[in-house]
Amino acid sequence: MASPGSGFWSFGSEDGSGDPENPGTARAWCQVAQKFTGGIGNKLCALLYGDSEKPAESGGSVTSRAATRKVACTCDQKPCSCPKGDVNYALLHATDLLPACEGERPTLAFLQDVMNILLQYVVKSFDRSTKVIDFHYPNELLQEYNWELADQPQNLEEILTHCQTTLKYAIKTGHPRYFNQLSTGLDMVGLAADWLTSTANTNMFTYEIAPVFVLLEYVTLKKMREIIGWPGGSGDGIFSPGGAISNMYAMLIARYKMFPEVKEKGMAAVPRLIAFTSEHSHFSLKKGAAALGIGTDSVILIKCDERGKMIPSDLERRILEVKQKGFVPFLVSATAGTTVYGAFDPLLAVADICKKYKIWMHVDAAWGGGLLMSRKHKWKLNGVERANSVTWNPHKMMGVPLQCSALLVREEGLMQSCNQMHASYLFQQDKHYDLSYDTGDKALQCGRHVDVFKLWLMWRAKGTTGFEAHIDKCLELAEYLYNIIKNREGYEMVFDGKPQHTNVCFWFVPPSLRVLEDNEERMSRLSKVAPVIKARMMEYGTTMVSYQPLGDKVNFFRMVISNPAATHQDIDFLIEEIERLGQDL
């Protein structure tokens, strides 16, 4: 294991584990030896201690090992201001950190050095000369490092090395040339908020254990409902572990609204329920139906037009078919920003149909909800205010660190009635404050992570206008890419017309295929192009873009932009890199 006294780590050169008042001990000499750099100090310490006194392998008592690693504070200040260079991580374990006696100084030093690793990673994430990914195949990583869990603890030097190794092979999702997922970017205020949230380490189920966070969730959800267009921000909502769970919440509440007895008696007490969503919608709708006992066969996929938008006439036709069979339509899930095409279903037309047949209307705006922050683009969600529930993921288009997904419900109190179980050890009715702030009983979870603070703090730092500028920039970059490649040799668009969102879908056609007729052989060969280029991107580590087939369309690239760090130059680079990597195919 490399010494922390050299190279990347630069943790300092002194070991404070010795007893300064007893210079005759090996420990005191070790402290002197630690003044040598380049790892020599650690080697000298090993010689001075001998094999029998190595803290990690000695096999001696816990007390003797702790004494060997003891770090004494001499500054008498709170917090401790002793130089971190006095700490030798090779001689320390997690048990030497707080709440250990005299654990303050090594704790501060250790966390500061973890922070240094993180900060270097943050800086590298925005450096275009660094790789987006240092790709290794799974078997290579498994063979190159020992990832197994052991019975005996490792020292803190090794723990810091694990931190470095983990980040070395992690995807730099904040890199300006990472376009692979809907969630990209690395916001500094959001990152700081996430660190604070983890430090507070509390749960969101009652006001008494999360007073500030519960209030911030109340304020933030109300603001989001106002932006949707519900009068005065009325309604309800909750932050959940992602858009898939938010969509399942909507399905759960819609079912309860129509058949409240299902909560106690189960699906056997209700007729067969049918949900409707577009054929381009997110797979989470079917997952939710499976989890809730409704069944995937009870999710009817509605046809889309060539741009990926739900066709209202087909929706109404399928509703009538279901009703004629004696089944009960209970939910229509429209999509505002589909995952692949970035399409926006015609919400006003869908709302009219839902009103006509008295069906719960849900809008999955996990990807497109961020456009509500933009005066220029929010028209694409016209009609969202007529929905009964909305999924909105700020961790996507708004760049909030994962995870941050909200379900907003128009009817106040419905979520509480649907999910509450009155656990008396948490939700006592005789508390000395307003019990409406004990939000945990309306959630499916008991333990619930604090997801709101990242969004709230970013909103305070950026303002609504800052989010608007972020979103407008990303959509402008998508239009820039579209305008470059729509008539460029070697590119074919998957659908005609300017994209509505930042999704730009296209094929790159290598020179060898450009002369072929548009037939089955050409399509078969074209389907193999995107996977090979993507693999080469990852091998070189220069950029990342997703690809997929859809319906009768063979593998194509789906470019999405949600990272405000991206520029026109990064789009130019992407085009050139695709051409470089695909010319010989």
UniProtKB/Swiss-Prot annotation:
The modification Phosphoserine is found at S3, S6, S10, S13, S17. The modification N6-(pyridoxal phosphate)lysine is found at K396. The keyword Nucleotide-binding does not apply. It catalyses: L-glutamate + H(+) = 4-aminobutanoate + CO2. Substrate binds at Q181, L182, S183, R558. Homodimer. This is Glutamate decarboxylase 2.
